[in-house]
Amino acid sequence: MSNSTLTLAQMLIARRSLTPDDDGCQKMIMHRLAGLGFKSDSMTFGEVENLWTRKGSDAPLVCFAGHTDVVPTGPVTQWDSDPFTPVVRDGFLYGRGAADMKTSLAAFVTAIEEFIELHPDHKGSIALLITSDEEGPAVDGTVKVVEALQTRGEMIDYCIVGEPTCTNQLGDTIKNGRRGSLSGNLTVRGIQGHIAYPHLARNPIHTAAPAIAELAQTVWDNGNEYFPATTWHISNIHGGTGATNVIPGEINLLFNFRFSTASTVDSLKARVHEILDRHGLDYELIWELSGKPYLTPRGTLADAVSAAIREVTGIEPELSTTGGTSDGRFIADICQQVVEFGPRNATIHKINESVEVADVERLARIYRLTLENLLL
C-alpha cells in the first residue's frame, strides 16, 4: 500500500490547486473510486468544486473529509525544489500540500481500496467529502455540500477529517473539536474638532477606552473538560486623521472571540452590548460568525481512531481542541461524531512543506484500521 499511497500523493501534489482551483484532483479521486462501486456527485458553486462520493446505502456511514486546495507557495526561489514538483529527499516528501492535506487524501483512497479488497462484505457505507475551498473564504465549499446533504436527508454517522493534527510524531494528537470564531467590527462615534478646543468636540478614543479595558479584562467563561476558557482580543484599531491637532470623529476596532462550548454566540453578543451600552457609547457593531464550536466526546469514533493509532504507532493519542477552525464545524451539523486526524503539522503553509515518507504508509494503515474498527 505504501507505494500506491506515495504515488497518489505525488500525483495530487503535482496539481497546482491554489484556492479555489481544484485542477483535476477530485476527478482523479473520483475515477479511482468508481471501479469500487462509488457513486459520485460533483457539486460546483461559483468557482469552487466539491465532490461527494459514496458506496453503499446502509448505516453506519463513515465519511472521510478533506480539501484539495492549497495556500500560495510564497517565494518559489526560497524552496529547495519546485513546490508543485513533488520530490522525495532524505526520507521526506516535499511539495505544497504534502502535509496539508494531499497525503491525507491519498491515504483515504488507498485505505478504502485495501479495506474493500480485504472485506468486500463489510457492513455500512463509506463516503468522501472533498472541497477546493477550505483554505479560502470557505463559503462555497463544505458548508454548501452539507446543506445539500441536509436537504435530501443524508446524514453521516462518523466523520474523519484529514487535517494535519500531529505535533511531534504521527499519532500523538486527535482533534475532537474546535473552538468557535466570532468577530466584531466596532465603530465608536464622537465629534471631530480642534484639539485646542476639546469642549467643542467629543473624543471617541477617550470615551471608548474604559469599555475596551473592561472587555479585555472580562472572564467570559472558564472553559470545560475539553476546551480552554473563551478569549477576546483586538486585532486592529484605528482612529484619527494622522494630524496631531485634530480630535477624531470616530474610532474603529476589529476584535475576535475564540469561544468554547461553555458560551454561546448569543451570550457573548449580549455581554458585549451590555458593556458598551453601560459606558454610554454611541456605536455601531457588525458581527460575523465564522463557525460555532463543535465537540465529539470520547466515544465510538474517537476510540476507533485511537485504537488504530495504537496498533500502528504504539502511541496513545491525546484528544485536543486547540488550533483554528476547520471544515469540521460545518460537518458537525449533520454528524454527531467528527474528529480530525492527519500527519504532522510542523511545515504546513511554510516554505519546503513536507511529510515523512514513512508516515505516508502508516497514515493509510491507520485509516484502514479505523474502517475495520467501525464497519466490521
From Swiss-Prot:
GO BP of this protein: diaminopimelate biosynthetic process; L-arginine biosynthetic process; lysine biosynthetic process via diaminopimelate
Listed GO MF terms: acetylornithine deacetylase activity; cobalt ion binding; succinyl-diaminopimelate desuccinylase activity; zinc ion binding
E.C. number(s) listed in UniProt: 3.5.1.18
Cofactor, how bound (note): Binds 2 Zn(2+) or Co(2+) ions per subunit.
Keyword Metal-binding in record: yes
Keywords: Amino-acid biosynthesis, Cobalt, Diaminopimelate biosynthesis, Hydrolase, Lysine biosynthesis, Metal-binding, Zinc
Biological or metabolic pathway of the protein: Amino-acid biosynthesis; L-lysine biosynthesis via DAP pathway; LL-2,6-diaminopimelate from (S)-tetrahydrodipicolinate (succinylase route): step 3/3
Reactions catalysed according to its record: N-succinyl-(2S,6S)-2,6-diaminopimelate + H2O = (2S,6S)-2,6-diaminopimelate + succinate
Residue numbers binding Zn(2+) 2: D100, E135, H349
Class of this enzyme: hydrolase
Pfam families in alphabetical order: M20_dimer, Peptidase_M20
Residues of the active site: D69, E134
Requisite cofactors: Zn(2+); Co(2+)
Gene3D superfamilies cross-referenced by the UniProt entry: Zn peptidases
Binding site for Zn(2+) 1: H67, D100, E163
Domain of life (superkingdom): Bacteria
Record SUPFAM superfamilies: Bacterial exopeptidase dimerisation domain (SSF55031), Zn-dependent exopeptidases (SSF53187)
PANTHER family associated with the record: ACETYLORNITHINE DEACETYLASE, N-ACETYL-L-CITRULLINE DEACETYLASE
Function: Catalyzes the hydrolysis of N-succinyl-L,L-diaminopimelic acid (SDAP), forming succinate and LL-2,6-diaminopimelate (DAP), an intermediate involved in the bacterial biosynthesis of lysine and meso-diaminopimelic acid, an essential component of bacterial cell walls.
Assembly and binders: Homodimer.
Entry similarity comment: Belongs to the peptidase M20A family. DapE subfamily.
Name under which the protein is recorded: Succinyl-diaminopimelate desuccinylase
Organism whose genome encodes this protein: Nitrosomonas europaea (strain ATCC 19718 / CIP 103999 / KCTC 2705 / NBRC 14298)
The encoding gene: dapE
